[in-house]
């Protein structure tokens, strides 16, 4: 419960006593006893909750933990405020505006109607019931919105997981394919094949013909490569068992 002090006479008032006190001190303002902020007759209703002693004396880094009951009450106040915003019945709208100024608005229908009768001096039970129905309608809407948002979040998370799994699978497949392609080339016996091809052709061949024969061997071994030309030239230069003379290559006798 929020307590105020009248800045005209100094009398302390509970929040639900401020309206009555305004008949005594008409043009006054009120200071919150806890936070010392000043409120007018129009703004005091918005001051629903004030700082606790722990917040007041706990230092600048203190963070107040919201208990479950308080969380439920705050959610209920949100429903009341939404009802005020969207209700089209002017009587209900004005009634809910006056209700919104109270700290602990009952969350059960029977208690809510009794609260309107006792605290708001409302004698029209039909109006009280319409006010309850307006809040209940917003509660249903908020519940549906929460379910829809949760479903959208779950769909998004599922899509992200599936995309990540697909990307991982694609990377794995590409890596495996690269390993399969690269493995035969890394184990391909270049020097032995070069010497064998030369022996099969009388110890001498044109470089172009030898390269073609080597590429056929590579393809048969499943080791096709985009840079086979440069690899062939490098392997040929390093092969001590052959000599290169212009466009021909011969075995060293």
Curated annotation (Swiss-Prot):
GO terms for biological process: negative regulation of transcription by RNA polymerase II; rRNA processing. A zinc finger (C2HC LYAR-type) spans 1-26, 27-51. InterPro entries: LYAR (IPR039999), Znf_C2H2_LYAR (IPR014898), Znf_C2H2_sf (IPR036236). Gene3D superfamilies: 1.10.10.2100, 3.30.1490.490. Zn(2+) 2 binds at residues 32, 35, 47, 50. One of its GO terms (molecular function) is DNA binding. Zn(2+) 1 binds at residues 6, 9, 21, 25. Residues 136-171 form a coiled coil. Signal peptide: none annotated. It is found in: Nucleus. Keywords: Coiled coil, Metal-binding, Nucleus, Repeat, Zinc, Zinc-finger. GO terms for cellular component: nucleolus. PROSITE patterns: ZF_C2HC_LYAR. It comes from the Eukaryota. PANTHER family: CELL GROWTH-REGULATING NUCLEOLAR PROTEIN, CELL GROWTH-REGULATING NUCLEOLAR PROTEIN LYAR. This is Uncharacterized protein C16C10.8. The lineage of its organism: Eukaryota, Metazoa, Ecdysozoa, Nematoda, Chromadorea.
């Amino acid at each position: 419960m929020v307590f105020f002090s009248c800045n005209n006479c100094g009398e302390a008032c509970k929040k639900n006593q401020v309206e009555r006190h305004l008949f005594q001190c008409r043009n006054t303002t009120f200071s919150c006893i806890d936070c010392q902020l000043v409120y007018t007759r129009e703004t005091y209703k918005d001051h629903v909750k004030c700082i606790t002693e722990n917040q007041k004396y706990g230092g600048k880094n203190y963070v107040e933990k919201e208990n479950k009951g308080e969380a439920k009450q705050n959610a209920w106040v949100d429903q009341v405020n939404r009802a005020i915003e969207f209700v089209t019945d002017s009587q209900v709208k004005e009634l809910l505006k006056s209700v919104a100024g109270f700290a602990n608005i009952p969350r059960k229908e029977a208690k809510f109607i009794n609260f309107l009768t006792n605290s708001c001096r409302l004698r029209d039970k039909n109006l009280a019931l319409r006010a309850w129905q307006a809040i209940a309608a917003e509660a249903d809407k908020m519940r549906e919105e929460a379910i829809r948002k949760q479903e959208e979040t779950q769909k998004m998370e599922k899509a992200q997981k599936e995309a990540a799994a697909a990307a991982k699978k694609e990377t794995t497949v590409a890596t495996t394919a690269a390993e399969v392609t690269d493995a035969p080339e890394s184990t391909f016996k270049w020097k032995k094949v070069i010497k064998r091809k030369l022996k099969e052709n009388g110890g001498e061949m044109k470089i172009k013909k030898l390269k073609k024969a080597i590429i056929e061997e590579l393809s048969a071994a499943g080791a096709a490569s985009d840079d086979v030309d440069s690899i062939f030239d490098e392997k040929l230069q390093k092969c001590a068992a052959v000599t290169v003379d212009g466009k021909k290559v011969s075995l060293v006798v």
